[in-house]
Amino acid sequence: MDLAHLQDVIERTYGERDRERGVPSTVAWLAEEVGELAQAVRKGDHAQRVHEFADVLAWVASLANQVGVDLGEAVQRYARGCPRCAAVPCSCP
């Protein structure tokens, strides 16, 4: 699934509810999911990690939808490698 499709699915599935919840609460939910991902990385098995990565991506897509950010456009920042030094691999100090 590409990022545009993810954003579309999240919008159609949760968009109305997400807008009612609002940006501050969505950020809080995203932070909670990042915490769950961190725990799964430390202590979980592969299936738990996949689950938590999916949840984080869904909340990122929700937040992006609410604030009008196209994630496909956003990731272009990394299209040529490191956004600071433009090298692959990064050669930043």
Q: How would you describe each model-predicted region?
A:
Residues 1-53, 57-93:
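Flexible "arm" and connector segments at domain edges
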